[in-house]
A protein has these predicted regions:
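Solvent-exposed loop and beta-edge segments used for protein-protein assembly and interaction
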Residues: 76-78, 89-91, 182-184, 200
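Residues embedded in well-ordered secondary-structure elements
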Residues: 73, 86, 135, 179-181
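Aliphatic-rich helix starts adjacent to a transmembrane/signal segment
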Residues: 2-64
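A short, compositionally biased
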Residues: 77, 102-106, 183-190
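Short linear sequence signals and composition-biased patches located at protein termini or domain-edge surfaces
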Residues: 143-212
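Type IV pilin-like appendage domain
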Residues: 79-164
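Short, glycine/small-hydrophobic-rich surface segments
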Residues: 62-86
Length: 212
């Protein structure tokens, strides 16, 4: 008696292949989703770390402000830039933070002049900070994807736009000498606005207390 050979029919094989193909696609989509989530999380983490580093530098600059009596103000704001005199181990240094348009929409740029030890060099560096265009040596794009920023000074028991508090950038006096200085405010508030898709959507507000 001949034994009957048992096996899969062609239809069963095709059905099995279709099922395996569907499972493979689902598995790939799952892996792809995990990879995309990981990449997005990593990018977000890097952006957050960079933001924290930049804000820490901003705070450090403000904490190091030194009233030198050699320039109009230890801290000045003209709307486009915030300039300050900060102390370093090598001497005094002029630092300027500015908002500059770029391909991402806008960037927060930090310029740092050389540390100097003479009044003349400090005044020259201050005057140079009034003419920055954004690409000078010492300039660094700290954050990108921005749409704008606002700066407020705390004086007379309240916050006000830095240009309306009396801490405007002073004009130079006769002979190119800086005009009398203006005392810094008690605190500084910066509001950074980020564009959609930048990874840091919305506004970030940071308040920094000055002085002892």
């Amino acid at each position: 008696m001949t034994r009957r050979v048992v096996g899969f029919t062609l239809v069963e094989v095709l059905v099995a292949m279709v099922i395996m193909a569907i499972m493979a696609v689902m598995a790939w989509q799952g892996v792809d989703g995990i990879v995309r989530t990981r990449d997005a999380t990593q990018a977000r983490l890097e952006q957050t770390l960079r933001l924290n580093t930049v804000i820490a530098q901003w705070d450090q600059d403000l904490a190091s402000i030194q009233d030198s009596n050699a320039v109009p103000q230890a801290l000045a704001c003209d709307g486009a830039s915030v300039r300050m005199v900060r102390r370093t181990p090598e001497g005094l240094q002029i630092v300027a933070w500015s908002f500059r348009p770029d391909d991402s929409g806008g960037a927060w740029v930090r310029w740092a002049g050389p540390a100097v030890t003479s009044i003349g060099d400090l005044q020259d560096s201050w005057l140079r900070s009034l003419q920055l265009q954004g690409g000078e040596q010492g300039s660094l794009k700290t954050l990108t994807g921005m749409t704008g920023w606002q700066v407020y000074f705390y004086q007379t028991n309240g916050w006000a736009n830095c240009q309306s508090t009396g801490n405007k950038v002073a004009q130079t006096g006769s002979g190119g000498q800086p005009a009398p200085r203006i005392a810094p405010p008690a605190g500084v508030r910066v509001v950074l606005s980020f564009a959609p898709g930048s990874g840091l959507n919305g506004d970030l507000t940071r308040d920094t207390l000055l002085g002892p």
